[in-house]
Design a protein with these regions (language model features):
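Extended recognition/assembly regions associated with phosphoester-bond processing machinery
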Residues: 1-549
Length: 549
């Protein structure tokens, strides 16, 4: 690509795709600049193959005789078809299949950017909304017999159940566990005896601000717990696509960091385009019609102290330009659904809105990119039946949850992030504990509650690939595209970069493909459902079957 053309594009604020740049280099410098000048007049910010399809008429007028045909041939655009049906319809011919795929993506929930002033009363309303939503779920559970409100509990001993929000938690001098629970009518102390091992173990993992149901006996003075019931996200019926299509799940690309594994990321893009691997691998790659990117797409600027020492791109917009340049290479029939994370150019408080045009304008120029909030709920639709719902959440709450839950901290859940997601599903909430993440309270709905149960939940943040199944919900945790940072070494994290989970949406079978090697790609794990379990075969471990319950 000629340096003069690149400099001219930069002066015009235009991002030039590598493939188009190489084609333009075959024209005279004057003609190439004329084309770029025309692009800037059309308010195009990215010059790629798709742009030439859309603006065929305008570009024909300024190009020399035969030049348009030459450019189209080199870019792989079918000019024979466009001549038969007119240039205007060329776009629909080239993009008809990809547009169908974008119509198959329905955004069910994506939070907007609130501008309202937040007051103390908004937090009060927020917790009341959370309680009411969880109570509606819990009161359907048959285990909660004789359900009553706290203000209706008498001083006489009796058996009953209550639903409340955990206001306090402490260990008594006799090593029993005491919870203070509140509902909209009052508070009550409940005791979990250490001799009831199963209930006691369950109670140890309860976080403050969780909404739970308890069954037992007692009076207004003291209530003794026999059973704890959590809200539990339960998928009653699994949903499958009618079409044989797959979804790939990635996150934590961290473009702009010196640790960004660009070569491996481009290798993944080459694979998804069907240009890498043996015939079977290429065939499987072309089944991927959806790419979910779950946050931390760039490394950002000023996210943590002295970050600039580890950055090779120190401007946020330039980081997004680089990201857009990479994503623009992905074939156009792949719908890319992208939500932000803590390193992206949006507010840190959750729910985080979709990436805006101020810094991430290059992404808005890509037709096959769908920008959603964090969290977001997306459906891949079927024609005549329910589609497959996918809940995206980057996962800022995962580390605070691990630190606050004994059982997760003990098993070092940073290495098995699906266990943290299981905890979220049990509590039906992405961040049960107040202050674990900064959030914006909504007086109408708890946007971090799992109100609509998904078929698949996908997360990132911990830089470890992992898959699991819980209550029929498929859990997919993404890897990263960044080598180990000094911070991760300091805290003892062990990232596994360049590993991509692929889910067949027709069968719900899962593969994890490794792009970390220089020469070849390898399926390192394959999983299939058997009833309520996910049976996985891990390559290189004597083909043992690992049962994930």
């Amino acid at each position: 690509m000629k340096t003069e053309i690149l400099k001219f594009c930069m002066a015009k604020g235009i991002l030039l795709d590598r493939e188009v740049g190489e084609v333009l280099s075959e024209f005279s410098e004057e003609t190439a600049k004329e084309i770029i000048e025309k692009v800037s007049m059309l308010k195009g910010k990215i010059i790629n193959r798709n742009f030439f399809c859309k603006n065929a008429d305008s570009l024909k007028e300024i190009m020399p005789e035969g030049g348009f045909e030459k450019l189209c041939i080199n870019l792989g655009i079918s000019i024979e078809i466009s001549r038969e049906i007119s240039p205007i319809n060329a776009e629909s011919v080239v993009e008809s299949e990809s547009m169908n795929h974008r119509r198959n993506v329905r955004v069910l929930y994506s939070s907007s950017n609130q501008t309202k002033k937040i007051e103390v009363k908004d937090f009060t309303k927020y917790f009341r909304v959370r309680y009411s939503m969880m109570r509606t779920v819990l009161q359907e559970r048959p285990e909660l017999e004789n359900l009553t409100s706290i203000n209706k509990i008498s001083n006489q001993k009796q058996s009953f159940s209550i639903i409340g929000l955990v206001y306090g938690k402490r260990v008594t001098k006799n090593k029993n566990l005491m919870l203070e629970i509140e509902d909209l009518t009052g508070k009550i102390l409940v005791l979990i005896n250490q001799n009831k091992e199963e209930v006691y173990s369950q109670a140890q993992d309860i976080l403050l601000d969780s909404v739970i149901g308890v069954r037992g006996s007692g009076s207004r003075e003291m209530f003794f717990v026999n059973e704890i019931i959590l809200p539990e996200a339960i998928l009653r019926e699994k949903n499958y696509l009618d079409r044989d299509e797959c979804a790939a799940f990635i996150s934590d690309i961290h473009i702009g960091s010196k640790m960004f594994l660009e070569k491996n990321f481009l290798k993944f893009i080459e694979w998804i385009n069907g240009d890498l691997g043996d015939n079977k691998q290429r065939e499987e790659a072309l089944k991927v019609k959806y790419l979910f990117i779950t946050g931390d797409t760039i490394d950002g600027v000023g996210v943590y102290p002295n970050q600039e020492q580890l950055s090779n791109i120190k401007d946020i917009t330039e980081q997004y330009q680089k990201l857009a340049s990479c994503l623009s290479r992905i074939r156009n029939d792949v719908s890319i659904i992208l939500c932000p994370g803590q390193h992206d150019a949006v507010r840190v408080a959750e729910p985080q809105p979709a990436l805006g045009k101020e810094f991430a304008w290059p992404l808005h120029e890509l037709d096959n990119v769908i920008l959603v909030s964090n969290p977001a709920l997306v459906e891949i639709v079927n024609e005549k039946k329910k589609g497959v719902k996918i809940l995206m959440y980057h996962g800022a709450s995962m580390t605070p949850i691990i630190n606050g839950v004994d059982s997760l901290r003990t098993i070092k859940a940073h290495d098995t992030p699906s266990k943290v997601v299981r905890f979220m599903l049990k509590n039906r909430h992405l961040c049960p504990i107040h202050s674990a993440v900064t959030y914006i309270p909504n007086e109408k709905v708890d946007e971090l509650a799992i109100s609509d149960v998904p078929d698949i939940i996908t997360t990132g943040d911990l830089h470890k690939p992992d898959v699991d199944i819980y209550n029929n919900i498929l859990i997919v945790c993404s890897s990263c595209w960044q080598s180990t940072t000094p911070f991760e070494e300091k805290v003892g994290n062990h990232p596994e970069p360049c590993k991509v989970p692929i889910v067949n949406l027709k069968t719900r079978a899962v593969k994890i493909i490794d792009f970390s090697e220089d020469e070849e790609i390898e399926e390192i794990k394959t999983c299939e459902e058997k009833g309520s379990e996910l049976v996985c075969e891990v390559k290189g471990e004597k083909k043992e079957e690992v049962i994930v319950k």
